[in-house]
Amino acid sequence: MANLQVRDTVFCRFIGTESNLLEVFNAIRKTGYTDASKVMITTLAGSFYSNIKNDISFMLDALIMMLIEHQTTLNPNMPVRLLGYVDELFKRYIEPEKRKIYSTELIKLPAPEFYVFYDGEDTSFEHKELRLSDAFKTPSDKLELVVHVYNLATGKNEDLKKICKPLREYSIFSNHYKLLRKQGLTVDEAVRDTIRYCIDNDVMKNYLLHNESEVIDMFGFEWNEKEEREALLEAGEARGIAIGETRGRLNSIRDLLSDGLVTLDALKASGRYSPEELAAIAKS
């Protein structure tokens, strides 16, 4: 199974340009910035020394640092993941002045904001907040990180889409694809038909005309991987439940993991397992 973490998604490629990110910024914060040159993309791409990779991050005038993640399966652990990302971004930001961190001079930092754009099948919510404190074993307000989750499903956050063309167009693209899949088209058929539909209706037109083969590859892989992962998880759970024990359920998932049919990252991303269950699954 290919590793989605080392591949970009259509969302990241399309949304992650300076001009589109400026539109997202203005729509979310209700501002009116017009100069895309003020946007500095800071996305963590991973390297030989660090495998930390996020979807999109950028700064505007070095005042605001916005971190954006795209998900088709909502992950309740996003606050702690984003905490790791912003930690790495701050380390890189202060690198030129790192000696000052031990001085009496205060190092000024861009204010971070955290967003997830959800693109899955759950239409029960429009906007929700995920809080780092929800994961604490005992109540505490000493450290907090709030992630704002926006649902891109049809009929959700239409006011936001109305004022943000990139999000509106991506939502049309994605939701049309999902509609075709529900009608029985294969992944490849649905991707190709969606591209044609969007080009004909001037949706993501320029991007799709210049990147059609890449989009077919990326979007097809993204949704194939998602559907395969969910099917494997459901199959593993069914095997465990048939035994009538939670132990059997976890052992079945562990078998899938050891056989290379699912990854620990995929299990974490599914949001179906507690940290304790993941630790039990990971045991050899």
Where are these regions (language model features)?
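Elongated, amphipathic alpha-helical interaction scaffolds
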Residues: 1-284
